[in-house]
């Protein structure tokens, strides 16, 4: 989500949600597995730092990207930030609900606010992502 983690730490709120059943990237994206597909979104920490999200652009549907590559941008009232894939693969779907109402990301970041679905190239990349406890250490 954002490469400048150190700048975010000073603004961390203690009530952020980090579900234990998800994996996380150091760029502040979360990932959950549904079969051979990864569902990806930004973390509660990321959305809290961005503020009110007004537009999400994912021009990469149908493309195959490597883990760590930019798959889209997230525009908030105060900034625009790149979104990075935590796992590589083909982007098979962009969340139409987020396209219609980007504020869903702020309201339900781990549910209806998911961003993309990716058919993973290498499922082992998922295993290499951060656990909830490790992600909490990163942001805390």
Functional labels for PLM-detected ranges:
Residues 2-73, 103, 107-140:
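Acidic, low-complexity mobile loops and tails
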Residues 22-25, 82-88:
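Short coil-to-beta-strand transition motifs
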Residues 47-48, 61, 90-91, 97-98:
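Short, charged/polar surface micro-motifs in flexible loops or helix N-caps
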Residues 44, 78, 87:
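A short beta-strand motif that forms part of the nucleic acid-binding face
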Residues 76-79, 96:
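Short, conserved catalytic or interaction motifs in soluble domains
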